[in-house]
Amino acid sequence: MAKEDVIEIEGKVVETMPNAMFTVELENGHQILATVSGKIRKNYIRILVGDRVTVEMSPYDLTRGRITYRFK
């Protein structure tokens, strides 16, 4: 997937699930299933319920995403 094809949107973590999966509520009110990107996992950045995050989504599957940034 080319970098130009991704959709970046901000959201809030609503629920923590097993295997580093999270339910994220986007700014537009939709809820998606998101996983943690490799760099966040490698640097041991903790993501908790209530955190604001940036999510990358593919235009082909708008129900799943990848968390790429956690706001302080």
Swiss-Prot record:
One of the essential components for the initiation of protein synthesis. Stabilizes the binding of IF-2 and IF-3 on the 30S subunit to which N-formylmethionyl-tRNA(fMet) subsequently binds. Helps modulate mRNA selection, yielding the 30S pre-initiation complex (PIC). Upon addition of the 50S ribosomal subunit IF-1, IF-2 and IF-3 are released leaving the mature 70S translation initiation complex. InterPro entries: NA-bd_OB-fold, RNA-binding_domain_S1_IF1, S1_domain, TIF_IF1. One of its GO terms (cellular component) is cytosol. The gene is infA. Belongs to the IF-1 family. GO terms for molecular function: ribosome binding; rRNA binding; translation initiation factor activity. This is Translation initiation factor IF-1. Keywords: Cytoplasm, Initiation factor, Protein biosynthesis, RNA-binding, rRNA-binding. Residues 1-72 form the S1-like domain. PROSITE patterns: S1_IF1_TYPE. It is found in: Cytoplasm. It comes from the Bacteria. It comes from Streptococcus pyogenes serotype M1. Its main location: cytoplasm. Component of the 30S ribosomal translation pre-initiation complex which assembles on the 30S ribosome in the order IF-2 and IF-3, IF-1 and N-formylmethionyl-tRNA(fMet); mRNA recruitment can occur at any time during PIC assembly.
